[in-house]
């Protein structure tokens, strides 16, 4: 079952996300991929797959991904954020992670959780249907 996945990474985490994406290219190519600007360009180049690119995170890209979550257009977020280097758009990062919690969206913030998400039989076989809160 094809899903829409957002892939986002802070500058110091971009190489890690690219390595992870290359390891999981066979699974990623089955899905619609969206990303913030710079990360999306790097992913397109490395994977040779189509990636819908939004603005760079500090220029509103995190908020654009957040809008997809609120509109029910995203199935999971893989967000390798950097907890050791503060970013000028940290409030946007917090808002994005908050939306994942509000809308019960699966989110992976490191390679361990991303591995578990992308290799889960529930995810791969489309057996998991997340409960979307009604407000």
UniProtKB/Swiss-Prot annotation:
InterPro entries in the record: Methylgl_synth (IPR004363), Methylglyoxal_synth_AS (IPR018148), MGS-like_dom (IPR011607), MGS-like_dom_sf (IPR036914)
Active site: 62
UniProt-listed NCBIfam families: MGSA, PRK05234.1
GO MF terms, alphabetically ordered: methylglyoxal synthase activity
Name of protein: Methylglyoxal synthase
Family listed: Belongs to the methylglyoxal synthase family.
Gene3D superfamilies, alphabetized: Methylglyoxal synthase-like domain
Gene: mgsA
Catalytic activity: dihydroxyacetone phosphate = methylglyoxal + phosphate
Gene Ontology CC entries for this record: cytosol
Keywords (A to Z) from UniProt: Lyase
Domain MGS-like span(s) in chain numbering: 1-135
Main EC class the enzyme belongs to: lyase
Keyword hit for Lyase: yes
Enzyme Commission number: 4.2.3.3
Organism: Pseudoalteromonas atlantica (strain T6c / ATCC BAA-1087)
């Amino acid at each position: 079952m094809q899903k829409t996945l957002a892939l986002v990474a802070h500058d110091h985490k971009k190489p890690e996300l690219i390595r992870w994406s290359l390891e999981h290219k066979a699974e990623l190519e089955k899905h619609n991929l969206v990303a913030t600007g710079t990360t999306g360009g790097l992913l397109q180049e490395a994977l040779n797959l189509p990636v819908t690119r939004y603005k760079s995170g500090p220029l509103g890209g995190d908020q654009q991904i957040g809008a997809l979550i609120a509109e029910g257009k995203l199935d999971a977020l893989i967000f390798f954020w950097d907890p050791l280097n503060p970013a000028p758009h940290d409030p946007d990062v917090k808002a994005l992670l908050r939306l994942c919690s509000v809308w019960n969206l699966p989110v992976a913030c490191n390679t361990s959780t991303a591995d578990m998400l992308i290799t889960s039989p529930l995810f791969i076989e489309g057996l998991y249907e997340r409960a979307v809160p009604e407000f």
